[in-house]
């Protein structure tokens, strides 16, 4: 049935439908959450994230794409179940991170750090470098153009990221360009400090 289908959706804002007979079908208050700018799981958040751990990243990505906040139970569940992301293919993770970083609000990537998602998707790699604090990285992401290489370099520049791009199954060209951009930025930081 339609209701059963909607019940299996990830978030309330995605659990609406339209019927010619009855109009909008909204059993899970998706319209209300849209109006309140909230990302909330349909039903029990832990169940939704257990069904598909990629939904954890999707919550953060929707938060960035729509500039919505994540409802408390949903946030607690995604924090608790972040280790399940280790079971998700690197390609699927790359796709969600790409959409997050290329969104209008890439600063929402801070949720990846505060919820413990980063060490799960980058195999324990949570070292913010001395040259660049998390806050600086987030500010630079917001100010940067929506360019794939630039945003990935900025995002990973705050991490000890040896091999991260390779582990996420990026092509060699992307890896090479991001590494060059990162090296250029590190050199510029050193030059600015010595000036």
Where are these regions (language model features)?
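Catalytic cores of the polymerase beta-like nucleotidyltransferase superfamily
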Residues: 1-195
């Amino acid at each position: 049935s339609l209701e059963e289908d909607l019940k299996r959706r990830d978030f309330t804002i995605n659990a609406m439908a339209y019927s010619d007979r009855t109009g909008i079908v909204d059993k899970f208050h998706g319209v209300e959450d849209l109006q309140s700018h909230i990302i909330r799981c349909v039903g029990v958040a832990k169940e939704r994230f257990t069904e598909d751990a990629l939904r954890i990243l999707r919550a953060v990505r929707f938060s960035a794409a729509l500039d919505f906040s994540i409802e408390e139970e949903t946030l607690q569940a995604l924090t608790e179940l972040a280790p399940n992301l280790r079971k998700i293919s690197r390609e699927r993770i790359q796709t969600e991170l790409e959409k997050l970083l290329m969104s209008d609000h890439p600063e929402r990537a801070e949720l990846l750090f505060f919820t413990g998602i980063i060490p799960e998707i980058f195999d324990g790699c949570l070292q913010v470098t001395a040259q660049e604090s998390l806050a600086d990285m987030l500010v630079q992401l917001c100010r940067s153009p929506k360019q794939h290489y630039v945003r990935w370099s900025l995002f990973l520049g705050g991490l000890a990221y040896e091999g991260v791009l390779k582990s996420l199954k990026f092509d060699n060209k992307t890896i090479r360009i991001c590494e060059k951009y990162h090296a250029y930025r590190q050199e510029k930081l050193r030059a600015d400090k010595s000036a």
